[in-house]
Amino acid sequence: MAPSGPQPALPILVVLLGALLLGPGNAQTSVFPPEVILPRGGSVKVNCSASCDQPISLGMETPLPKKEILPGGNNWKMYELSNVQEDSQPMCYSNCPDGQSSAKTLLTVYWTPERVELAPLPPWQPVGKNLTLRCQVEGGAPRANLTVMLLRGEKELSRQSAVGEPAEVTTTVPVGRDDHGANFSCRTELDLRPYVLKLFENTSAPHQLQTFDLPATPPQLVSPQVLEVDTQGTVVCSLDGLFPVSEAQVSLALGDQKLNPTITYGNNSLSAKASVKVTAEEEGTQQLLCGVMLGNQTQETRQTVTIYSFPAPNVNLTKPEVSEGTEVIVECEAHPRAKVMLNGVPAQPPGPRAQFLLKATPEDNGRSFSCSATLEVAGQLVHKNQTRELRVLYGPRLDEKDCPGNWTWPENSQQTPMCQAWGNPLPQLKCLKDGTFPLPIGQSVTVTRDLEGTYLCQARSTRGEVTREVTVNVLSPRYEVVIIPVVAAAVILGTAGVATYLYNRQRKIRKYRLQQAQNGTPMKPNTQATPP
């Protein structure tokens, strides 16, 4: 509570009393102190005096509670006024033989405001927009000495006089990003220093400001334009220029399906990524929505997603396993709006169905028939493939390519006999010399004289058997010594013969041309065929 006002001491009053008393003449009433400032509810002592020595009457008129203190003198009285709640002017009066008179003292009551309140700030304030601060002040006196300040932290934004009851003070300030989290408050100052008192301050509770900056551009939404039923797609929504980005929220939804995104925050940007899986109930056109919410504003982007159902095409064979020579129908069928293509089939009009007739051969065993179906969805082509394999049953085969009929190997060399039998089912193969000595097919062996000879290779399966003779020749070192010079001599003689023939031919041509030139006969091109 503010301190009490000054109380005049009795000795001082008595001393001053004589100075205030006037000599004989016109009647005059005096009051001391003439002015007093005191806290509301306080008390004060006031002296009333008359100019004559023996006043007929001397007193005070006031609505305030009063009582006379001290014995007083013939021409003065002292009163104590208590519970002073508001400004007042008590009046001292006197009635002397030469006339009546009166005098007033001015009581000024001071008190600090009962309520200093800053109006609530908006939950979110857009950056770049002006903010209006409003402060209400109830009570406080004297108003001439009461001012109201609006503050940002301790920085003074505005100072105004308190006018009216309650007094309301407003000011408008621009808001930037650096104002986010700043505290704003209202403060009153009751300056009684001119009355030799002090400065009284009252401050409201601070309010914290939250600012935000949401760009006018909509979020960027990246997603597939088409989605197949029971498949999963990825949706990414991003936006730059957000402040404060940590307070931004993202909402992603496909139709009635709310997505659960994972949000990654940058300095002033965010990216929300979510997986979406669609069902047959959602087939058709759906709206994909991305909303970024910050403060009390939202930016949205919408995109159309087409959800479709497209089963893989069916590839059907008359029978997946047939005997050699059997006719097989290969058929591919897909979605009614799809176009199919069977590999290895002559071109057919585009449509959802294709087929052809095949006469199975051993070469068709293990053959894959692939069907490709294409469907147009929302301007995009989507593809599905299906493959079936045909198994052809045929008897054993042994041919020169996979089972050579003659091998010639040097003695003591390392060789691997190879003979592959074909058939479905795969036949068993064995090669025997004289019905007992086996040829180690597929195994690395050291060539010896015992390996030489003719072998009967037999391939057998449930669909029959086939045989083939295979001869193994073993070259001994002596045979190699004889055969090598013979082969070398043959090569030399052959080369010499060819060279002699070419020389004689060129010589005859030159001779013929010379004769023709001498006889004046035009030359004809030589069309003689080159001898083999």
UniProtKB/Swiss-Prot annotation:
Q: Which residues cross the membrane?
A: 481-503
The record ties this protein, via InterPro entries, to: ICAM, ICAM1_3_5_D2, ICAM_N, ICAM_VCAM, ICAM_VCAM_N, Ig-like_dom_sf, Ig-like_fold, Ig_sub
Quick check: keyword Nucleotide-binding in the entry? no
Please give the Gene Ontology molecular function terms for this protein.
integrin binding
Please give the residue ranges for the topological domain Extracellular.
28-480
Modified sites of kind Phosphothreonine: T521, T530
Matches recorded under SMART domains: IG
Source organism per entry reads Macaca mulatta
Q: Where in the cell is it found?
A: Membrane
Chain location of the short sequence motif Cell attachment site per the record = 152-154
| Sugar attachment sites | N47, N130, N145, N183, N202, N267, N296, N316, N385, N406
The protein here is known as: Intercellular adhesion molecule 1
Q: How does it sit in the membrane?
A: Single-pass type I membrane protein
What function does this protein fulfil? ICAM proteins are ligands for the leukocyte adhesion protein LFA-1 (integrin alpha-L/beta-2). During leukocyte trans-endothelial migration, ICAM1 engagement promotes the assembly of endothelial apical cups through ARHGEF26/SGEF and RHOG activation.
Subunit structure, interactors included: Homodimer. Interacts with MUC1 and promotes cell aggregation in epithelial cells. Interacts with ARHGEF26/SGEF. Interacts (on T cell side) with CD81, CD247 and CD9 at immunological synapses between antigen-presenting cells and T cells.
Q: Where is the Ig-like C2-type domain?
A: 41-103, 128-193, 230-297, 325-378, 412-464
Give residue spans, biased composition: Polar residues: 515-532
